[in-house]
Regions:
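Conserved beta-loop-beta element that borders a ligand/cofactor-binding pocket
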Residues: 116, 151-177
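Short-chain dehydrogenase/reductase
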Residues: 90-94, 129-130, 134, 140-153, ...
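N-terminal Rossmann NAD(P)H-binding glycine-rich loop of SDR-like oxidoreductase domains
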Residues: 2-24
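NAD(P)H-binding glycine-rich loop region in Rossmannoid oxidoreductase-like domains
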Residues: 33-95, 103
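Glycine/proline-rich active-site loop of Rossmann-fold NAD(P)-dependent oxidoreductases
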Residues: 161-164, 176-188, 220-230, 253-255
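Conserved Rossmann-fold NAD(P)-dependent oxidoreductase catalytic core, especially the SDR/UDP-sugar
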Residues: 73, 77, 83-144
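A conserved pocket-lining segment of Rossmann-fold NAD(P)-dependent short-chain dehydrogenase/reductase
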Residues: 82-83, 138-140, 180, 187-209, ...
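Mid/C-terminal beta-alpha module of Rossmann-like enzyme folds, strongest
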Residues: 217-285, 303, 308, 317-337
Length: 337
């Protein structure tokens, strides 16, 4: 029997569906059973047991872990741009991970697969070799980056203290279908589709991966006799311009950028982001801290370890992933309208 925390999120929901379809007994953990917005899709699946698993409630987590063989801890607060949420994001990642692991150990769960992030790995200079699972970022000025990094480090410490069998999966920015509410990754794509970069694309890249490939990495990490960290990210990390060219080919109404934005304007990207939000209604997706962290750096992450140790492969192209994401964004927008 399996447990998925954060089961109403983009990754969590797709993981629940995949496990159920593979014939596993699935327990889906959510913050509150009394919130229809967070439970309706899970209830509609059928064959899935819903339980409350609030990260601040150790008693709920312990009850949710009872009888579980493999626990997938995917619950997190994912936010780059909302001011004043730093402590909430940090607590959910650090205290939440520790509480989940202690509950799993107490319930004698056989294995825990914890969802971390490629943001725990350092950005690199353009000519440097890619970062991998042996590396840890030291630039913690972005609250979400700090939360995921400190959360995973605490998880490894606690797992060691408790003798708990744990592996971590480090996804990139998750694309693809199967979401009801936007994440920052989805906000970025929606903003681009609405013309947020029509006047210029920054000379930056994006660490993409499809949700179906992230699910596959989690399942393989659970099934294989393995240990350590595994980066689940596409083979290449595309530039914003190449992403927009692909999106324009999917939907010609999505505008291409008029130019490559000069490097000296990169620091002003958060200002442009706020202006686009005010004038075009695009979602905000970039903070000043993240823009500063990326100055002169790129996302360059190796997925070699996941390929060699797990037998994982990128199976969904960027084009298919963007197509499915754009279709889901439009469907959600129409439903809410």
């Amino acid at each position: 029997q399996t447990l998925v925390t954060g089961a109403n999120g983009h990754l969590g929901y797709n993981l629940v569906v995949a496990l159920r379809d593979a014939g596993h007994r699935v327990r889906a953990g959510v913050r509150s059973l009394g919130d229809p917005a967070r439970t309706a899709r899970l209830k509609a699946l059928g064959g899935v047991e819903l339980v409350e698993a609030e990260l601040r409630r150790p008693d709920q987590l312990r009850a949710a872990m009872d009888g579980i063989d493999v626990a997938f801890h995917a619950a997190a607060v994912y936010d780059y741009v909302t001011p004043g949420r730093g402590q909430e994001i940090l607590d959910a990642s650090v205290r939440g991970a520790e509480a989940a692991l202690r509950a799993a150990a107490d319930a004698r769960v056989r294995k825990v697969v914890l969802t971390s992030s490629v943001v725990t790995l350092p950005f690199t200079a353009p000519d440097d070799p890619p970062s991998d699972e042996n590396d840890w970022t030291t630039d913690l000025r972005v609250p979400y980056v700090r939360a995921k990094t400190e959360g995973e480090r605490v998880a490894w410490r606690v797992a060691g203290e408790l003798g708990l069998n744990m592996v971590t999966v480090l996804p990139g920015a998750i694309l693809g279908p199967g979401f009801a509410r936007n994440t920052p990754s989805i906000d970025a794509i929606e903003a681009m589709s609405m013309g947020a970069l029509r006047f210029g694309a920054p000379d930056m890249n994006f660490p993409l991966v499809d949700v179906r490939d992230v699910v596959a990495a989690h399942v393989l990490a659970a099934e294989q006799d393995c240990e350590g960290r595994f980066a689940a990210i596409n083979d290449t990390q595309p530039t914003f311009r190449s992403m927009l060219e692909t999106m324009h080919a999917i939907d010609p109404k999505i505008p291409l950028p008029m130019m490559q934005m000069p490097g000296f304007l990169a620091r002003a990207l958060p200002l442009f982001d706020r202006l686009n939000h005010a004038m075009l209604g695009t979602p905000q997706s970039l903070s000043s801290e993240l823009a500063a962290s990326l100055q002169g750096k790129i996302w360059n992450v190796s997925n070699r370890r996941a390929k060699e140790r797990l037998g994982w492969r990128q199976s969904i192209t960027m084009e298919q992933s963007l197509r499915d994401k754009l279709e889901t964004i439009r469907a959600n927008r129409n439903r809410h309208a």
